[in-house]
From Swiss-Prot:
Protein keywords: Ribonucleoprotein, Ribosomal protein
One Pfam family, short name: Ribosomal_L36
UniProt-listed HAMAP family: Ribosomal_bL36
GO CC term (a single one): ribonucleoprotein complex
UniProt organism field: Aliivibrio salmonicida (strain LFI1238)
Family: Belongs to the bacterial ribosomal protein bL36 family.
GO biological process: translation
Designated name of the protein: Large ribosomal subunit protein bL36
Any one GO MF annotation of this record: structural constituent of ribosome
Cited PROSITE patterns: RIBOSOMAL_L36
Length: 45
């Protein structure tokens, strides 16, 4: 999983990529091609 400062290009890498917010972080998940996974932001305390 890559840690990126901007997810704009990450979400458009594959047509099945989705953006999900979990615990203060923004994730790009792609079930058909998991190498496109990415995350942005730090975990909230």
């Amino acid at each position: 999983m890559k840690v990126l400062s901007s997810l704009k290009s990450a979400k458009s890498r594959h047509k099945d990529c989705q953006i999900v917010k979990r615990k203060g972080r923004v994730f790009v998940i792609c079930k058909t091609n998991p190498r496109f996974k990415a995350v942005q932001g730090k975990k909230k305390k």
